[in-house]
């Protein structure tokens, strides 16, 4: 890349480097060095060659990496949670929400935060987080579970599969 900056296919060179780094990313429980390197290269493709197929594919791969990192935070949080190390678990769950807000793991992370707050006796914090969960994910199974641990059993006419939660504002 350094020696051929003016080449008409330089975008492809950057893309190949990013894909190579992406393929070296390992499982959720492994070291993040390769992951961060892949993120850097993928972002470089996205920023330098926006609007290209390379940038589009790099964006998809970057999203997958972010989901993987969020999953790792969640797994570590559960590890601490299972050992009743609630503050360490809370930090990991909050990291999922703050660092990976577009990941598929935010719903569960919010629910786990509620669990921690309930375990610590922080009822108002649990309710506030449940409001956030319900606002952002009103039809989520995690929202129904949150309702049950904060407020008790769901009303009979409300079911996770059957709906009704959109009309229910249990935390308001």
Language model feature labels by segment:
Residues 1-172:
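Acidic, polar-rich low-complexity tracts and alpha-helical solenoid repeat scaffolds
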């Amino acid at each position: 890349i350094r020696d051929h900056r003016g080449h008409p296919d330089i975008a492809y060179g950057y893309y190949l480097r990013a894909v190579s780094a992406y393929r070296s990313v390992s499982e959720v429980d492994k070291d993040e060095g390769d992951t961060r390197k892949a993120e850097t290269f993928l972002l470089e493709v996205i920023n330098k060659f926006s609007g290209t197929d390379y940038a589009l594919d790099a964006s998809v791969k970057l999203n997958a990496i972010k989901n993987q990192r969020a999953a790792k935070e969640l797994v570590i949080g559960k590890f601490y949670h299972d050992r009743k190390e609630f503050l360490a678990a809370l930090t990991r769950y909050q990291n999922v929400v703050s660092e990976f807000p577009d990941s598929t793991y935010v719903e569960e992370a919010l629910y786990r935060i509620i669990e921690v707050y309930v375990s610590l006796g922080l009822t108002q914090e649990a309710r506030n987080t449940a409001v956030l969960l319900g606002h952002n994910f009103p039809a989520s199974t995690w929202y129904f579970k949150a309702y049950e641990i904060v407020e008790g059993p769901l009303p009979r006419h409300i079911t996770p599969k059957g709906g009704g939660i959109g009309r229910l504002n249990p935390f308001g």
